[in-house]
Amino acid sequence: MVNDKLIIDKKKFNSRLIVGTGKYKSMAECAKAIKLSGAEIVTVAVRRVNISDKKKPLLMDYIDPKKITYLPNTAGCFNSEEALRTLRLAREIGGWKLVKLEVLGDKKNLFPDMIETLKSTEVLTREGFRVMVYCNDDPLMAKRLENVGACAIMPLAAPIGSGLGIQNTTNIKIIRSQTKLPLIIDAGLGQASDAAIAMELGCDGVLANTAIAKAKKPFQMALAFKNGVIAGRQSYLAGRIEKSIYGSASSPKTGII
C-alpha cells in the first residue's frame, strides 16, 4: 500500500482519512485524536476556530500546519456571500488556496444549498481557489460541480452529525463511475464500519468529525476510523467476489473419499 496515495490538487497524502477539528472538549483532545487517526488533512471552520487571535489559544499551537494540511471550510455559512467572504478571509490569514466549501440551506437538517454551492464554486475557482465541495448525493449536480472547476467532490452520507452512515450507496456508485476527481464521503458517518463501506464503494477518502469527537472514547474511535479506512481501501483494491443466490463449495470436488 506504499504507493497507494490520496492525491488532491497534485499533492500526495498517505492517509485517506480527513478529520474535522470541531466539537472536541479541548484543542488538546482534538490534537491527540488527530494524531491517533493518522490524518494528514484537517478541516478548520474559519468562523468558529481561532486561527488568528494571538490573545487566545490558537489551533496552530496544537496542530502544526507545517506537518498537517489545514483545509479551511465555510461551516455555518448559509449563502454564497458568507461563504465567499469567509474563504477570502482564510486566504488573507494563512494564504490558503485549497479550501472546503459548504453552503447550508437549512438549519435543522444542514443539507447543502446546491444552487448557492454551485455559484460559489464557480466564483472561487475563477479567483484561483482549489475547491473541495460538500454536496448532496445527486450525480447530476456532482457533474456540474466538476464542470465549473471543483477539485474534489464531497457528497454527504447522511445529514451532518447524524451518525446514520451511508444512506444511498447507489448514488455514490454512480458518482464514482462518472468522475475521476477525488471522491470523499463527507458528513453523517457514525462508526468505523461506515468508513470501510465508503472505501469499498470506491471512494478516495472519508471525512469524520462528530463520529470521533463525540464518541464515548474519542481516541479509540480515531484509531478505529484509521483502521476502517485502511481495511475498506484494501478490500476495494482486492476486488470482492461476485454475489450469487447459490452456494459454492469451498472444498475441492476431486479426491473425495
UniProtKB/Swiss-Prot annotation:
Cellular component annotations (GO), alphabetically ordered: cytoplasm
Residue sites binding 1-deoxy-D-xylulose 5-phosphate per the record: G161, A187, G188, N209, T210
Matches recorded under InterPro entries: Aldolase_TIM, Thiazole_synthase_ThiG, ThiG
Active site: K100 (schiff-base intermediate with dxp)
GO molecular function list: thiazole synthase activity
Main location: cytoplasm
Pathway: Cofactor biosynthesis; thiamine diphosphate biosynthesis
EC assignment: 2.8.1.10
Pfam families registered for this protein in UniProt: ThiG
Subcellular location field: Cytoplasm
Cross-referenced SUPFAM superfamilies: ThiG-like (SSF110399)
Reaction(s) catalysed (UniProt annotation): [ThiS sulfur-carrier protein]-C-terminal-Gly-aminoethanethioate + 2-iminoacetate + 1-deoxy-D-xylulose 5-phosphate = [ThiS sulfur-carrier protein]-C-terminal Gly-Gly + 2-[(2R,5Z)-2-carboxy-4-methylthiazol-5(2H)-ylidene]ethyl phosphate + 2 H2O + H(+)
Any GO BP annotation: thiamine diphosphate biosynthetic process
Record's keyword annotation contains Cytoplasm: yes
Family designation: Belongs to the ThiG family.
Known partners and oligomeric status: Homotetramer. Forms heterodimers with either ThiH or ThiS.
Protein name: Thiazole synthase
Origin species: Pelagibacter ubique (strain HTCC1062)
Biological classification of the source: Bacteria, Pseudomonadati, Pseudomonadota, Alphaproteobacteria, Candidatus Pelagibacterales
